[in-house]
Amino acid sequence: MGSTQSVSGTPARPLPRNKQVARVADPRSPSAGIQRTPIQVESSPQPSLPAEQLNGLKQAQDPDPRSPTLGIARTPMKISGPDPQCSLVKELSEVLETEASESISSPELALPRETPLFYDLDLSSDPQLSPEDQLLPWSQAELDPKQVFTKEEAKQSAETIAASQNSDKPSRDPETPQSSGSKRSRRKANSKVLGRSPLTILQDDNSPGTLTLRQGKRPSALSENVKDLKEGVVLGTGRFLKAGGGAREPNQDHDKENQHFALLES
């Protein structure tokens, strides 16, 4: 049919190859195609420190080489020394000290002198006055008529209250304890309106404390029959029945339950 040596018209494709696996030494690894963040082996970048601090760190680390953290850089300690104070701080402290000294030295200037002192009054003008009159010569002249009026009203109200209390005293019994007149008057008014004491409410017809005629005991037929049986009753047949129940009707010989009781004829 054709020649034994046939050549394909299309070129053959190369074998598929993964780009991620191409750089892996062993492509059979289960995690060969997974890209990972490379581990940074190099030391972390340290901030650039001035030469003075570096020298101080070296001096601090040199005396004790047995420290377990000898190569680790630490925050340098603050060198203890006299810190120069700021000029503003000095000025403020001086101002505060001066203000405090002035306030302590002159306490009388801070207090206003509104009233004249005792030794400022001219007492030599009128030697006949007493010391109280000399201290307060204007006390009687400055009394207001309103204050006098209020004092009179207070006295009148006190007198009226005392009179009302005196009028209430005779109505009370000497043996009973004292109580306010308003409470007693209220109790009396309530008793008059009700017409009976509050305890009589419990003795009404509907209360369980009182016995009515319906609740009284009545003689029952059964109790009478029991009494008759104990004393002895003559039956219709003419026989005498005793309390022991020895005699009974001939038709009740077989009845053991009713041998102690007789039949009642209605």
Swiss-Prot record:
InterPro entries xref list: CDCA3
Subunit comment: Interacts with SKP1. Part of a SCF (SKP1-cullin-F-box) protein ligase complex.
Feature: compositional bias, Basic and acidic residues: 143-156, 250-259
Keywords: Cell cycle, Cell division, Cytoplasm, Mitosis, Phosphoprotein, Ubl conjugation, Ubl conjugation pathway
Predominant location category: cytoplasm
Sequence positions bearing Phosphothreonine: T37, T75, T200, T210
This protein's GO CC annotations: adherens junction; cytosol
Gene Ontology BP annotations: cell division; protein ubiquitination
Record-listed Phosphoserine modification sites: S29, S31, S44, S67, S93, S197, S207
Feature: compositional bias, Polar residues: 32-46, 157-168, 203-213
Chain segments carrying region F-box-like: 90-119
Chain spans, region Disordered: 1-84, 120-225, 242-266
Species assigned in the record: Mus musculus
Domain observations: The KEN box is required for the association with the APC/C-Cdh1 complex.
This protein's pathway: Protein modification; protein ubiquitination
Annotated compartments: Cytoplasm, Cytosol
Record-given protein name: Cell division cycle-associated protein 3
Source superkingdom: Eukaryota
Its biological purpose: F-box-like protein which is required for entry into mitosis. Acts by participating in E3 ligase complexes that mediate the ubiquitination and degradation of WEE1 kinase at G2/M phase.
PTM field: Ubiquitinated and degraded by the APC/C-Cdh1 complex.
Short sequence motif named KEN box, residue ranges: 256-258
